[in-house]
């Protein structure tokens, strides 16, 4: 009798444990579904305002090279690759003045222009950010892809932060890294560091 009572108690705890595991699994699926929502509509390119550029008013600016990776090799062979989604981020760090972005070009490994991402000069307000996204299926840039970003300003300003973030969550593995931009050329007065 004691053994039967112990078995019933054990079966009860097993059932409760299975129900609890099911509930936790269901909650995890719901949480995962929430993380795949599209970004808010106010993010990205919508923070830019098209402007007419008057070159005589330009006081400072830069041309910035930003290395990006469409994919990377893994394991011990170049036959195995992980595709990466890329976000180019341009952040105006000046507290008072806007910058004007004049060029955002995307190049492949051989230095061939793939596409111009900016049609017209566009103003980025003080402390605002703009981003450009390339999906993980966009592999035409190759391992040595890059962006060339040009910006100018009508005031002496703090230089913007321009960088690329590469991400992959392929096969349940999370991989991400940042690639900072490198200034190739100063236009006009050098900006404060």
Label each PLM-derived region with a short phrase.
Residues 43-79, 176-193:
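Transition segment at domain starts
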Residues 5-17:
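Bacterial N-terminal signal peptides that target proteins for export
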Residues 112-146:
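Intrinsically disordered, low-complexity Pro/Gly/Ser/Thr-rich segments with frequent PxxP/GP/PP motifs
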Residues 90-97:
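Asparagine-centered strand-capping/turn motif at beta-strand->loop junctions
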Residues 25-28:
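C-terminal motif of bacterial Sec signal peptides marking the signal peptidase cleavage site
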Residues 80-87:
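Short, solvent-exposed loop/turn segments enriched in Ser/Thr/Gly
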Residues 30-32:
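Bacterial signal peptide processing site
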Residues 38-42, 138-192:
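Terminal connector regions
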């Amino acid at each position: 009798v004691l053994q039967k009572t112990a078995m019933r108690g054990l079966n009860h705890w097993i059932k409760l444990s299975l129900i609890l595991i099911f509930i936790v699994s269901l909650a995890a699926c719901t949480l995962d579904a929430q993380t795949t929502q599209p970004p808010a509509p106010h993010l990205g390119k919508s923070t830019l305002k098209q402007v007419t550029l008057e070159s005589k008013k330009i006081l400072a600016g830069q041309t910035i090279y930003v290395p990006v990776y469409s994919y990377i090799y893994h394991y011990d062979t170049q036959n195995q690759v992980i595709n990466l989604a890329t976000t180019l981020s341009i952040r105006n760090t000046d507290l008072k003045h806007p910058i004007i972005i004049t060029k955002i070009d995307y190049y492949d490994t051989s230095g061939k222009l793939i596409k111009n991402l900016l049609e017209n000069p566009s103003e980025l307000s003080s402390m605002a950010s703009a981003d450009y996204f390339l999906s993980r299926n966009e592999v035409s840039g190759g391992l040595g892809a890059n962006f060339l970003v040009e910006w100018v300003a009508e005031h002496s300003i703090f230089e913007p932060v321009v960088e690329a973030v590469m991400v992959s969550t392929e096969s349940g593995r999370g991989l991400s890294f940042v690639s900072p931009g490198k200034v190739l050329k100063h236009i006009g007065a050098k900006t404060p560091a």
